[in-house]
């Protein structure tokens, strides 16, 4: 579960290492984001020479969440960290590689490019 001021690890090669959530997309009163939800974030830590710089405002999709997500069969999928992938306005990833596993819920939310780039889908 991600809300405003939550810091997330970046799971792609855009150059950002850590982002801070500043808004959850999907309505003016929406408070929480889970796996597959889009957030607006600012880059808090970045590597030199990357696509994004520190202070940039970006859109990102949550790919791993400590809170986890409930599946149709009643099971839960949980991760050890909160992580996101930076996306463009057309919902495609800005980077060319995805690091670490991603949840199967991204396929239901139509983030096929992220699912295909990910090394493991849980």
Curated annotation (Swiss-Prot):
Superkingdom per UniProt: Bacteria
Keywords, comma-separated and alphabetical: Ribonucleoprotein, Ribosomal protein, RNA-binding, rRNA-binding
InterPro entries associated with the record: Ribosomal_uL14, Ribosomal_uL14_bac-type, Ribosomal_uL14_CS, Ribosomal_uL14_sf
Keyword Ribosomal protein: yes
Listed Pfam families: Ribosomal_L14
Protein's UniProt keywords contain Repeat: no
GO BP, sorted A to Z: translation
GO function terms (MF aspect): large ribosomal subunit rRNA binding; structural constituent of ribosome
Oligomer and partners: Part of the 50S ribosomal subunit. Forms a cluster with proteins L3 and L19. In the 70S ribosome, L14 and L19 interact and together make contacts with the 16S rRNA in bridges B5 and B8.
Similarity remark: Belongs to the universal ribosomal protein uL14 family.
Purpose of the protein: Binds to 23S rRNA. Forms part of two intersubunit bridges in the 70S ribosome.
HAMAP family: Ribosomal_uL14
PANTHER family in UniProt: 50S/60S RIBOSOMAL PROTEIN L14/L23, LARGE RIBOSOMAL SUBUNIT PROTEIN UL14M
NCBIfam families, A to Z: rplN_bact
Protein name: Large ribosomal subunit protein uL14
Chain's gene name: rplN
